[in-house]
Regions:
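Acidic/aromatic-lined carbohydrate-recognition and catalytic surfaces
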Residues: 30-217, 221-222, 227, 241, ...
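Short, Lys/Arg-enriched N-terminal segments with co-localized hydrophobic residues
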Residues: 1-8
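Loop/helix patches that line or flank the sugar-binding groove of alpha-linked glycan CAZymes
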Residues: 364-505, 512, 539
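Alpha-helical packing segments of well-folded alpha/beta enzyme cores
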Residues: 84, 127, 131, 228-239, ...
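C-terminal beta-strand-rich structural cap/linker in extracellular carbohydrate-active enzymes
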Residues: 530-550
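Sec-dependent N-terminal signal peptides of Gram-positive bacterial secreted proteins and lipoproteins
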Residues: 14-31
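Solvent-exposed beta-hairpin/edge-strand motifs
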Residues: 509-525
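Active-site-proximal helices and loops of the catalytic beta/alpha 8
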Residues: 35-44, 150, 158-176, 234-235, ...
Length: 550
């Protein structure tokens, strides 16, 4: 009996020991389910955002003609934009910039024939008012392209000006309207009066010339005339009263051809008039020039100017050339980050990579590089601008403008727009990429990568607004850049692995940071940023970690 009891006790001990071992290793096994090649997989918050109502956001540039066709005529329209506002919002954009929507004789509509009318191809004023209302319901700001340095040659303003000038030259009696319009545009009495570098054309049925630096259909307004300012104020008031949140000003160097100080005076007056109507109106200007010139234009008080030196237009731009370079990639990008801020001074930087006038940046790099470049853009201070279609990897060379204004492929039963006339046959062979619908379903797509970049940006207000300090930089391996950004008493760290091939391990705690709170990884479905058992973090190639300050 004692022997049996002893055997039972022995069996019990073995069972208990076995159970204990099972429990211990079971727990370890469970906890290690999240432990892989890159350490512990961090649980991320993929829903919460912290969006502030200011001018530091993420804008989405839309060429309406090629965006979404709501009525089946092959031409994108305002109702199509309204239909896709949820798509834009879900991506993480906080504002939209509409390329010109006014009545025009061209496909691009930069020659405006009526500043107070919507082009019939795009819809009606009621459609536009609905779009504004629906934007604001979703917390999306809307700015429109305002072309104020020139109008269209079919604009009644130009016709009135030419007729008044003809009467003036003939010595005929001028009406009050004639007096107003005879100097409304920049006219030259003879070809010898045309300044060097300025392009001018003979006015219709007249002996004099008019300035038109872009095309004969785009006569330049004369900002020596007070009546031009009156008209500009009326135009801005018309749209601000309808609820637009501001304007993108086209070609601001051409109010007075390359006369920068005079252009700054014009912009200062335009800005003052807009702010008198709506103090919160946001204005961004197109000054396609160097850092030195753009810095002069900020003296106008305009909120933002596009940072062309950092874009694809600059062969040495810090976003494109901040990767895949030997020895200086980190410094190139870091210095660019700082210059982006100092250039704007007290105003709002407006970094971008490409737009409707440039090659699409995805045409210049491979798939992984292009994704990482957008991640670099999303880490910059200011108000970023993204060109429609970039979020699905659309390509486009600059043989002709039409090549970079091709329709998005939605992958739906309707909505795709027809091609614009003039797209080159070479470009059509490259017009093959997964549709929007396909990319939404693909974890590793451009679409989902852009969405993640914008989510991280929207979760951390410090990214767009914070003061930058360098934590550490490893120039020897050309991999590690670690910076901090502090805003409103809160500080985060941003750790970059610039290597396209190699992992990076770093002890963030030695710099005072606690944990990873967000991550961007180019190869998202295969790799992640993880915490190792020794407290360090391991980052795969082409990745960015947002880390919490201790």
């Amino acid at each position: 009996m004692e022997q049996l009891r002893g055997k039972i006790m022995k069996i019990r001990k073995i069972c208990l020991l076995s159970l204990l071992i099972t429990l211990i290793f079971g727990v370890v096994s469970c906890s290690d389910n999240k432990y892989g090649e890159y350490g512990y997989r961090i649980e991320e918050d993929l829903t919460t955002t912290n969006i502030i109502d200011d001018n530091y956001g993420n804008f989405y540039e839309i060429f309406v003609r090629s965006f979404y066709d709501s009525d089946g005529d092959g031409i994108g329209d305002l109702k199509g934009v309204t239909k896709k506002l949820d798509y834009i919002s879900e991506l993480g954009f906080t504002g939209i910039w509409l390329m010109p929507i006014n009545k025009s004789s061209s496909y691009h509509k930069y020659n405006v024939d009526d500043y107070y009318a919507i082009d019939y191809q795009y819809g009606t004023m009621a459609d536009f008012e609905e779009l504004i209302a629906e934007c604001h319901k979703r917390g999306i700001k809307i700015i429109i392209d305002l072309v104020l340095n020139h109008s269209g040659s079919n604009n009644p303003l130009f016709n009135k000006a030419v007729n008044a000038r003809i009467k003036y030259q003939a010595g005929l009696e001028l009406s009050e309207a004639d007096e107003k319009f005879k100097d409304f545009y920049t006219f030259f009495d003879s070809s010898s009066d045309i300044p060097k570098g300025v392009t001018a054309y003979k006015a219709p049925n007249a002996s004099f010339y008019y300035e038109a630096n872009f095309d004969s259909s785009m006569p330049e307004l004369n900002y020596d005339s007070p009546y031009v300012y009156e008209e500009v104020r009326n135009i801005m008031k018309f749209y601000l009263d309808k609820g637009v949140d501001g304007f993108r000003l086209d070609a601001v160097k051409y109010f007075y051809y390359n006369y920068h100080s005079k252009n700054v005076e014009v912009l200062s007056k335009i800005n003052q008039m807009a702010k008198e109507i709506n103090p919160k109106a946001y204005i961004v200007g197109e000054c396609w020039d160097s850092d030195a010139v753009i810095s002069q234009y900020y003296k106008s008080g305009i909120d933002s100017f596009f940072n062309f030196p950092g874009s694809v237009t600059n062969p040495n731009g810090y976003i494109l050339n901040g990767i895949n370079r030997e020895g200086d990639a980190l410094n190139t990008y870091y210095e660019g980050m700082l210059k982006n801020i100092t250039l704007a001074g007290e105003y709002v930087p407006a970094p971008f990579i490409d737009n409707h006038d440039t090659v699409r940046f995805t045409s210049t790099r491979n798939y992984r590089n292009s994704k990482f470049q957008y991640a670099l853009l999303s880490m910059l201070n200011g108000n970023t601008f993204t060109y429609y279609g970039d979020e699905v990897g659309m390509v486009g060379t600059k043989e002709v403008d039409q090549n970079v204004r091709i329709p998005i492929l939605w992958g739906e039963e309707s909505g795709d727009c027809s091609l614009i006339s003039g797209v080159t046959s070479h470009e059509l062979t490259r017009y093959i990429y997964p549709t929007v619908s396909e990319q939404i379903a693909d974890e590793d797509s451009f679409y989902n990568f852009y969405k993640k970049c914008l989510l991280i940006r929207n979760q951390n207000p410090e990214i767009a607004r914070g003061n930058i300090e360098l934590v550490t930089m490893d120039r020897d391996t050309d991999k590690l850049l670690f910076i901090s950004k502090e805003y409103n008493g809160n500080k985060i760290g941003i750790v970059f692995n610039f290597s396209p091939y190699y992992d990076l391990t770093i002890d963030i705690k030695q710099y005072g940071y606690e944990e990873v709170i967000g991550q961007i990884v180019v190869d998202n479905s295969e790799k992640y940023i993880g915490e190792l058992k020794d407290g360090k973090i391991k980052m795969p190639s082409y990745s960015i970690a947002i880390v919490k300050w201790g």
